[in-house]
Amino acid sequence: VAEESKFDYIIGNPPFIGSKIMTQSQRDSVVREFDHVQGSGVLDYVTAWYIKAAKYIQGTRTKVAFVSTNSIVQGEQTSILWGQMLHKYNIKIHFAHRTFKWSNEAKGNAAVYCVIIGFASFDTPNKSIFEYEDIKGEAHEIKAKNINPYLVDAKDLLIEKKSNPICNVPKMSFGNMPLDGGHLLLTDEEKKEFLKREPDAKKFIKPLISAFEFLNGEKRWCLWLINAEPSELKRLPEVLKRVELVKKFRLASVAPSTQKFSTSPTLFRDRNQPSTYILVPSTTSENRKYIPVGFFGKNDIANNSCHIVPNGTLFHFGILTSEMHMAWVRSICGRLESRFRYSKDIVYNNFPWPQDLPKQKIQGVEKLAQQVLKVRERYPDSSLADLYDPLTMPTDLVHAHQELDKFVDSCYRHLPFSSEAKRMEFLFELYEKYTADLFTKEKVKRTKKKV
């Protein structure tokens, strides 16, 4: 390795290899480079280059700039990588190009969503963020006081997984995981054929709502046997055949955690089914301005490809489908390829909701949220995927969302937000305040317990 003093700059385009497609050798290299830090097994290959460079430039005036996939500034990877970069190696980001789309000719012109991050082991007063209004277009430069790991002009905060929301809102959970080998699930055609053979099973067949069905208006069904009496099941031989197949599937698994559920083959592995809930798809296209969310009841079984907010209200719906929440999603949410991969522990539980609102503000959000739902109902033949496609989104739905956005913004502050960057600066400040308040409350609780 050359002496550090010989280099003014290190510039590179490290390999774009995601954590799920790395070889074992590459994964071992990453974990080793991170000195076996907890969670390092989920990191992309490029993160090892960042740590390697951070170690190499310690005590020097060398500046580094890497082109990387944007996964390192979103989702669970961010706090793991930048926790080390900031706190162990005292790295400061000097400039950053926020997400842009880059066509990789070496991979058949495949689109890659990238960032460029310039950093050093010393600070500078001259920092710049390059923002892309159009991710396929040109950037415009914004001067910044500080650039945090999410490439926002805000303090160096790290959004880590939390098991509970930082605000007083319903706790989000996953939908219901079948773990059944497909034997408790039915397509629309399979349901019709099944009921021809066993009409008495009708009461146990419920709509199954996965992210795909929800967004595309498709139908799927499941056997929901949670309240089935043994005597009833004995009279349903076709149902019992499927239950037997579930038992065999679970017993055949190499995972002990799956095998133990063979003792309850009539049931889904995970069962989270409140009487009413808001459904949020776990994965959705990044091209949509808003993540479509919806209301469902106890007879609509949410699949584990969705998150649910039990007993969510129109107010919760309005905030979740607002531009304010979407700005948080775009900056904090992890990705599956380029699609949003919503996380309850990182995105929802850390989201700073507007607090201490007067009754008229809450009612205002509810009224405008209801209007969004009413406009959707005008298009019964269009799926949510159609309604929220940027090219086909109806103008009245666009208008309904814009009115909701403006009102939700006013729940946070009187002045409008001039850009997404300004929204995120505000949300990070609010996040810092809320989490500081939580820390103080927890400290008081612990002190009282000691007394």
Pin down the residues of each PLM region.
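Short, ligand-facing micro-motifs at secondary-structure edges
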Residues: 98, 285-300, 318, 327-338
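Glycine-rich, acidic and aromatic/proline-enriched surface loops and short helix-turn segments
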Residues: 12, 16, 322-329, 378
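Active-site-adjacent structural elements in folded domains
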Residues: 49-51, 333-338, 390-396
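Segments forming glycine/polar-rich beta-alpha architectures that bind adenosine-containing cofactors
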Residues: 5-12, 26, 155-305, 418-451
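Non-catalytic DNA-recognition/assembly elements of restriction-modification systems
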Residues: 238-246, 348-451
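Basic, amphipathic alpha-helical recognition segments used for DNA target recognition
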Residues: 307-349, 360-371
